[in-house]
């Protein structure tokens, strides 16, 4: 042990390049899909980080529509986080099998509150909550000129000439019915009982976002972060009840007894849920988490742009080596890893995937998009969004202190492992994802990789020094026009 103390040399993204290879594939034809687990297939290998300035329901919806996955952060109350998950699951459905409904005796105020909370434009009305026989429908059109919201729904709902369809109606058949009758919602009934709902918006979204990552019921995929704190059991329970697809046990040091015990407990309690555990940086840690029951291991100790773990605690492994070491172990188990942190350009994404990652987790590259929950600021005439590490003082005071095993400390005693800052505003997420995946596609074309599995197994690296890195970036020129996929 003593003799091997300095034996290991590690590499990160700026130390390596992929070697071009003979290719018979064009970038537009490569396959970017990845099967992370039995129940979680993504159409692009990108996951938005579970950080309080990166991912809430708005980001998670946008990520899933692009084919990726969003992790709802846990710096909020249990019920609030479950609501965020439910917003994602209800944002898009092929067929809504358990639609919201109200009864005629409830108030218009209650209908308005429900429709506003879940951003829906109408709700079916049933005779009672047990029999659920359809008796009407209430839409924004019915509420347009209502001034007294205390009146009962029965006084304003549409009751006559209701258009319905049987439960086995396909989306194609539903679209024709909706267009014929110029309506937006089609209740599905069996013997008069409400059994489902199809909306024109859901049909339009299927057409607009054909690459969306969905579950077996046609709903968008969503993940949520949990920790190892006192509220973890109830938090996990509420998230599962809300329909979460992936639970992420998110800690700064995944190779610890508390995390391993939590993995065993969560997997035993919810065996049907895809379970991610991390963060780690070694093969040994990866092995222990997989043996404890994790489906996926998240890799990265301190590489993030807002993380100070490596300088505060002096601990970490440069990210390319960490990914490769953990992926080498993951191959023995037939399971996946997520490369989390340190990614600055699209070229770093493909390096992470070629080194063994099945997907990457992004924070800083997405924090500036419209869909992130970070506050918008104007600084020196430019627009920015707030971005902070979950180990920053602000994030720890809000609830992420358990991630760094400081749950029992008073705020004045916190030892932060992250900073708070701002990142340039980038506009819509889909534009950023388009550029990032364009770079990945280009890299796969250069390496002759038809899909991500081939990239992982066949791509080769060359090491480079500081001169090679300098040569890789634009040099001997003053940049006068900013590129959408390069800033330095």
From Swiss-Prot:
For this chain, the family text in UniProt reads:
Belongs to the IMPDH/GMPR family.
Q: Which SUPFAM superfamilies match?
A: CBS-domain pair, Inosine monophosphate dehydrogenase (IMPDH)
* Gene symbol of the encoding locus: guaB
Print the keywords alphabetically.
CBS domain, GMP biosynthesis, Metal-binding, NAD, Oxidoreductase, Potassium, Purine biosynthesis, Repeat
- What protein am I looking at? Inosine-5'-monophosphate dehydrogenase
User: Disulfide bond: is it a keyword of this entry?
Assistant: no
What GO terms in the biological process aspect are recorded for it? GMP biosynthetic process; GTP biosynthetic process
Region listing for Disordered, in residue ranges:
468-488
User: Start and end of every CBS domain?
Assistant: 95-153, 157-216
Q: Subunit structure, briefly?
A: Homotetramer.
Question: Is Cell wall biogenesis/degradation given among the entry's keywords?
Answer: no
Which prosthetic group or cofactor does it need?
K(+)
Q: How is its activity regulated?
A: Mycophenolic acid (MPA) is a non-competitive inhibitor that prevents formation of the closed enzyme conformation by binding to the same site as the amobile flap. In contrast, mizoribine monophosphate (MZP) is a competitive inhibitor that induces the closed conformation. MPA is a potent inhibitor of mammalian IMPDHs but a poor inhibitor of the bacterial enzymes. MZP is a more potent inhibitor of bacterial IMPDH.
Organism name: Staphylococcus aureus (strain MW2)
Q: Which residues cross the membrane?
A: none
Which annotated residues bind IMP?
305, 340-342, 363-364, 387-391, 417
Function per UniProt: Catalyzes the conversion of inosine 5'-phosphate (IMP) to xanthosine 5'-phosphate (XMP), the first committed and rate-limiting step in the de novo synthesis of guanine nucleotides, and therefore plays an important role in the regulation of cell growth.
* Positions annotated to bind NAD(+): 250, 300-302
GO terms (molecular function) for this protein are: IMP dehydrogenase activity; metal ion binding; nucleotide binding
EC code: 1.1.1.205
Which stretches are tagged as biased composition: Polar residues?
475-488
């Amino acid at each position: 042990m003593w003799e091997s103390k300095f034996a290991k040399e590690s590499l990160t993204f700026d130390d390596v390049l992929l070697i071009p290879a003979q290719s018979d594939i064009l970038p537009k034809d490569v396959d970017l899909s990845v099967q992370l687990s039995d129940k979680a297939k993504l159409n692009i290998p990108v996951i938005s980080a579970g950080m309080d300035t990166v991912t809430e329901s708005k980001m998670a919806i946008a990520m899933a529509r692009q084919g990726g996955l969003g992790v709802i952060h846990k710096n909020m109350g249990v019920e609030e986080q479950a609501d965020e998950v439910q917003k994602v699951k209800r944002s898009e459905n092929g067929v809504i099998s358990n639609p919201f409904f109200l009864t005629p005796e409830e108030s218009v105020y209650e209908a308005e509150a429900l429709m506003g909370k879940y951003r829906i434009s109408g709700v079916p009305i049933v005779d009672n909550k047990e029999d659920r026989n359809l008796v009407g429908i209430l839409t924004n059109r019915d509420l347009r000129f209502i001034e007294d919201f205390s009146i009962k729904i029965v006084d304003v709902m549409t009751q006559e000439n209701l258009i319905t369809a049987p439960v086995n109606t396909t989306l194609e058949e539903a679209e024709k019915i909706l267009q014929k009758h110029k309506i937006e919602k089609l209740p599905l009934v069996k013997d008069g009982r409400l059994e489902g709902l199809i909306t024109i918006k859901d049909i339009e979204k299927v057409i607009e976002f054909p690459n969306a990552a969905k579950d077996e019921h046609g709903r968008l995929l969503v993940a949520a972060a949990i920790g190892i704190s006192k509220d973890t059991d109830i938090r996990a329970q509420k998230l599962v009840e809300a329909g979460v697809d992936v639970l992420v046990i998110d800690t700064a040091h995944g190779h610890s007894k508390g995390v391993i015990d939590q993995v065993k407990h969560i997997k035993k309690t919810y065996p049907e849920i895809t379970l991610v555990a991390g963060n780690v940086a070694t093969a040994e840690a990866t092995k222990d988490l997989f043996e404890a029951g994790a489906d996926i291991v998240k890799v990265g100790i301190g590489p993030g742009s807002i993380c100070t773990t490596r300088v505060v605690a002096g601990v970490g492994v440069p990210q390319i080596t960490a990914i490769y070491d953990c992926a080498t172990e993951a191959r023995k188990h037939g399971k996946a890893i997520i490369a989390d942190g340190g990614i600055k350009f699209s070229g770093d994404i493909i390096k992470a995937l070629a080194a063994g990652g099945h997907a990457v987790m992004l924070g800083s590259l997405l924090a500036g998009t419209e869909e992130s929950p970070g506050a918008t600021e104007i600084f020196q005439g430019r627009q920015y969004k707030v971005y902070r590490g979950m180990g920053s003082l602000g994030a720890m005071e809000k609830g992420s202190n358990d991630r760094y095993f400081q749950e029992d400390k008073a705020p004045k005693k916190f030892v932060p492992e992250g900073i708070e800052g701002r990142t340039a505003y980038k506009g819509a997420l889909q534009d950023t994802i388009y550029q990032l995946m364009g770079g990945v596609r280009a890299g796969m074309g250069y390496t002759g990789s038809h899909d991500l599995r081939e990239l992982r197994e066949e791509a080769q690296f060359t090491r480079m020094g500081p001169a090679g890195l300098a040569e890789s970036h634009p040099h001997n020129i003053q940049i006068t026009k900013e590129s959408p996929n390069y800033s330095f």
